[in-house]
Each structure stands twice: as C-alpha cells, then as structure tokens.
C-alpha cells in the first residue's frame, strides 16, 4: 500500500511539474509574441506617417510619384506583418489558456 501511495504521489508531482513547465513555456511565448506585435504596431504607424508625408510632398510637387508608391508599399507590407503578428499573438494566447487548464479543443 505504501509503495502504491508513493508511486501515486510521485506521478502526481511529476504531472504538476510538467504542467507548470508547460505554463511557463507558453507564457514566455505569449509575452514574446505580444512584445513583437507591439513593436510591429509602432513600426506600422511610422510607415503610415511616412506614406502620408510622401503623398503630401508629391501633391506639393516636391517629389515624384515613385516615392509615394514605394512608401505605400512599405506601409502595406508592414500592415501585413502586423496582421501576422496579431494572429501569432492570439494563437499563443489560446495555447496559454489551454496550458492553464482551459478546455479549448483542437
């Protein structure tokens, strides 16, 4: 009986340790993806302002239309990167929820 109880206690302790490790790992991943999304969000705002300024310069005759197109392309690429970063953040959030015991099926 004592051997069975000790084995059960050991199995329980290992399960708890594994669960805590999963939570720690997914929390690190979620925090990284959140920070990356915030960084890309700032970058996107900068590209949006750059595109707006290029358009203003073009309307004022100070630059060619190629600069407008280039800055718009950079802005749109950044928007795409932001959408991908947001998707990764949400995916990592779901993984964290599941690691914490949430019943989200796959």
Can you annotate each of these PLM segments?
Residues 98-106:
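Terminal intrinsically disordered/low-complexity segments used for targeting and assembly
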Residues 1-81, 88-99:
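Amphipathic alpha-helical coiled-coil segments
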């Amino acid at each position: 009986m004592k051997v069975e109880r000790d084995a059960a206690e050991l199995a329980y302790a290992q399960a708890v340790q594994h669960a805590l490790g999963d939570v720690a790992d997914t929390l690190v991943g979620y925090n990284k993806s959140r920070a990356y999304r915030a960084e890309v969000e700032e970058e996107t705002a900068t590209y949006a302002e750059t595109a707006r300024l290029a358009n203003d310069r073009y309307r004022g005759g100070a630059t060619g239309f190629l600069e407008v197109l280039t800055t718009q392309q950079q802005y749109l690429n950044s928007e795409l990167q932001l959408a991908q970063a947001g998707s990764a953040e949400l995916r990592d959030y779901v993984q964290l929820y599941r690691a914490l015991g949430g019943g989200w099926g796959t």
